[in-house]
Design a protein with these regions (language model features):
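Intrinsically disordered, low-complexity non-transmembrane regions of multi-pass membrane transporters
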Residues: 1, 196-210
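Helix-coil boundary and interhelical linker segments in multi-pass alpha-helical membrane proteins
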Residues: 1-6, 52-62, 106-120, 165-176
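Structural signature of hydrophobic alpha-helical transmembrane segments
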Residues: 3-15, 59-73, 117-129
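C-terminal ends of transmembrane helices
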Residues: 19-29, 49-52, 76-89, 134-144, ...
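Cytoplasmic-side transmembrane-helix entry/capping segments in multi-pass membrane proteins
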Residues: 34-40, 64-69, 89-100, 122-124, ...
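Short, structured motif recognition centered on aromatic/hydrophobic residues
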Residues: 38-42, 49-55, 123, 127, ...
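Small-residue-rich segments of transmembrane alpha-helices in multi-pass membrane proteins
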Residues: 40-48, 96-109, 127-128, 151-164, ...
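Ordered, amphipathic secondary-structure segments that act as subunit-interaction surfaces
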Residues: 73-111
């Protein structure tokens, strides 16, 4: 399978998963349909747009309307099937995690396709996977998940290093993507299940007197 096609498929799947997550958060805030769609679009294309601008290329969603259509499908999915998905305790979290892993891989692969070194590709993968969530939280007036709670962006970084290691061993791009996807998801699932997070910065008592 051609590299461009792989990236396109991953971006499409990631768009749907992230759009579902963003629209669900908007629904929890009692947004109307338009507000939910805007939130879904922001999550779905935010990270990839920043990545493409930094790579000096046209943002992926501007080359075809399929991504905006996909977000529309996600909106109708939440609007009409959300009540059946609500009893599934972790359904919304799963969509967010799938989007995170898929967009991380898409960011890495696209950066490598543009000839970037691997350390840049990992940063771009992390940006693609997590920036949309930051935009979502800002729109919803929430503290961005990436800055607190369980491991989020670090799951992207670790998944990126796994991808790099497999590529170094000469593994095919398809298998690298699958393994990296699984690892990123597993790290995120375990982090939430066992409340694993990075150390929290604490303000020095002396600084309060300054």
């Amino acid at each position: 399978m051609e590299q461009d096609l792989i990236i396109r498929i991953i971006e499409l799947l990631g768009t749907f998963a992230f759009a579902i997550s963003g629209i669900r958060h908007a629904a929890a805030k009692r947004f109307d349909w338009f507000g939910g769609y805007v939130c879904g679009v922001a999550v779905a294309i935010g990270g990839g747009t920043i990545r493409d601008v930094m790579l000096g290329t046209i943002p992926f969603w501007m080359t075809t309307p399929i991504y905006l259509i996909c977000t529309g499908v996600a909106l109708f999915t939440v609007a009409f099937f959300g009540k059946w998905m609500e009893p599934l305790k972790n359904a919304w979290f799963v969509f967010d995690t799938l989007g995170l892993a898929l967009f991380t891989i898409a960011g890495i692969q696209k950066s490598l396709a543009f000839g970037q070194p691997f350390w840049v590709a990992i940063i771009m993968g992390c940006l693609t996977g997590s920036a949309g969530g930051v935009i979502r939280d800002v729109l919803l007036n929430n503290e961005p998940v990436i800055f607190h709670k369980e491991i989020y962006a670090m799951a992207c970084v670790l998944g990126g290093f796994v991808y790099w290691g497999l590529v170094t061993l000469g593994i095919s791009a398809e298998l690298c993507a699958i393994v990296s996807f699984v690892i990123t998801c597993v790290i995120r699932f375990l982090a939430v299940k066992y409340h694993i997070s990075l150390p929290v910065l604490k303000e020095n008592d002396n600084s309060k007197n300054i």
